[in-house]
Amino acid sequence: PVVVNVMNAKLFESVNSTDLAKSLNYQSGLRVENNCQNCGFPQVRINGLEGPYSQILINSRPVVSALSGVYGLEQIPVNMIERVEVVRGGGSALFGANAVGGTINIITKDPINNSFQVSSTMSNMNGKVWEQYMGANASLVSKDNTYGIALYQSYRNRNPYDADGDGFSELGKLNMNTFGLRTYYRPTQFSRISLE
C-alpha cells in the first residue's frame, strides 16, 4: 500500500497559483527551487532528492521526460488540472524508473458539463518586475453525453528579476503560451475513445 496525498483545484485557487511549479510548494515533502539563473528552470525535490529522481505523470501516463519535467513545471497551468496526486518515496516498480524520490500524477479536467471560465492575474515582485497571467477554459458536452471536449489556454509574461542588482537575474525572463485539449467519444455505452 502507498500513501497518496491529493491537491485539488481549491488549493490552487486559495494560494492564487497560476502553474504547477508554484502549487507544489504547498505539499509536505516537496520543494520547488530555481536551479539556473540564466535559463530559469525550476525542479521539484521530493524527500530531498533532485528532480531526475522524481517521476511526473499526466493522467497516470509517463509522458513527461526528465528534461521536460524540469522545464515543464512552469508550463502546466493549474486551469487544466483537476487534482494532483503525490506519492512520496520509492515506487519505480509501479510508476517508472525515475520514481526514486516519489511520483507526481497530474489529473487533467474531464469534460463533464458545458462551462467557460476566464481568469487574469497581475503580480509584482518587490516593486521591480511585473508578471502577467491570463487563462481560459471551456468544455462542451453533447446532450446525450456521447462526446465532449475540454480546451484550456494560458499566457504568462515576466521580465527578468535581479533582486540584488549584481547583473544576474534570480528569475529569468518568461514568455509562455500554452494550449491543450482533452476530448472523448463514446460509440457505445461500454466503450470510450479519448484524445489528450
Q: What is the role of each PLM region?
A:
Residues 43, 83, 103, 133-137, ...:
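Membrane-embedded beta-strand positions in outer-membrane beta-barrel channels/transporters
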Residues 21-62, 82:
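Extracytoplasmic beta-strand/coil segments of soluble accessory domains associated
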Residues 24, 84-85, 104-106:
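Non-catalytic regulatory/gating segments with a bias toward low-complexity or hydrophobic composition
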Residues 39, 99, 129-133, 174-176:
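Membrane-spanning beta-strands of outer-membrane beta-barrel proteins
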Residues 43-45, 61-88, 109:
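Short acidic/polar hinge/loop motifs at secondary-structure boundaries
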